[in-house]
Amino acid sequence: MKTLKGHLSAKNLRIAIVGSCFNQAMADALVSGTQETFLKFGGSEDGLMTIRVPGAFEIPCTIKKLLSSERKFDAIVACGVLIQGETDHYNQIVNQVAAGIGALSLEFCLPITLSIVAAPSAEIAWQRSGIKGRHLGVSGMTTAIEMATLFTQI
């Protein structure tokens, strides 16, 4: 019986990060940790492209534009920080971004990981951005690397 499994080696991989700028300090920390993780697992600076967009809502459209271009990637990591406010706007954005990214992953049959921090407060958003605690960018990049290496075996 054969079992296929990805591994944590970014050597020779081409990965894109599409990160929002809104909630800038947290978003910058999220993107930075994502970039560092790619390099930590053997990826090269030439194998990594980072694209920054104004907000999380712009991430799915930017990913689609990227995937429709001549450039080829093994995986994409979507990074953004959304903090719940007093209106329903937060829920609308979170749902649209997640649905859009999921649809693109299926449409293009490409690993696109969701490193979108969706938090009820700035304190929790900081915890998920890597300043204190779990870093969603790190987990998103490690998942992207594992999935990209798995897809080369299928």
UniProtKB/Swiss-Prot annotation:
Superkingdom assignment: Bacteria
GO biological process: riboflavin biosynthetic process
Annotated catalytic residues: 89
Binding annotation for (2S)-2-hydroxy-3-oxobutyl phosphate: 86-87, 128
Any Pfam family matching the protein: DMRL_synthase
GO cellular component: cytosol; riboflavin synthase complex
Pathway: Cofactor biosynthesis; riboflavin biosynthesis; riboflavin from 2-hydroxy-3-oxobutyl phosphate and 5-amino-6-(D-ribitylamino)uracil: step 1/2
CDD domains to which the protein is assigned, alphabetical: Lumazine_synthase-I
UniProt-recorded Gene Ontology molecular function terms: 6,7-dimethyl-8-ribityllumazine synthase activity
Gene3D superfamilies: Lumazine/riboflavin synthase (3.40.50.960)
Keyword field: Riboflavin biosynthesis, Transferase
Entry EC number(s): 2.5.1.78
Matches recorded under InterPro entries: LS, LS/RS, LS/RS_sf
Group of enzyme by EC: transferase
Reaction(s) this enzyme catalyzes, per UniProt: (2S)-2-hydroxy-3-oxobutyl phosphate + 5-amino-6-(D-ribitylamino)uracil = 6,7-dimethyl-8-(1-D-ribityl)lumazine + phosphate + 2 H2O + H(+)
Residues reported to bind 5-amino-6-(D-ribitylamino)uracil: 22, 56-58, 81-83, 114
Presence of the UniProt keyword Transferase in the record: yes
Family statement: Belongs to the DMRL synthase family.
NCBIfam families: lumazine-synth
Role this protein plays: Catalyzes the formation of 6,7-dimethyl-8-ribityllumazine by condensation of 5-amino-6-(D-ribitylamino)uracil with 3,4-dihydroxy-2-butanone 4-phosphate. This is the penultimate step in the biosynthesis of riboflavin.
Stored PANTHER family: 6,7-DIMETHYL-8-RIBITYLLUMAZINE SYNTHASE, 6,7-DIMETHYL-8-RIBITYLLUMAZINE SYNTHASE DMRL SYNTHASE LUMAZINE SYNTHASE
Name this polypeptide is given: 6,7-dimethyl-8-ribityllumazine synthase
The species this protein was found in: Chlamydia pneumoniae (Chlamydophila pneumoniae)
Lineage: Bacteria, Pseudomonadati, Chlamydiota, Chlamydiia, Chlamydiales
Gene: ribH
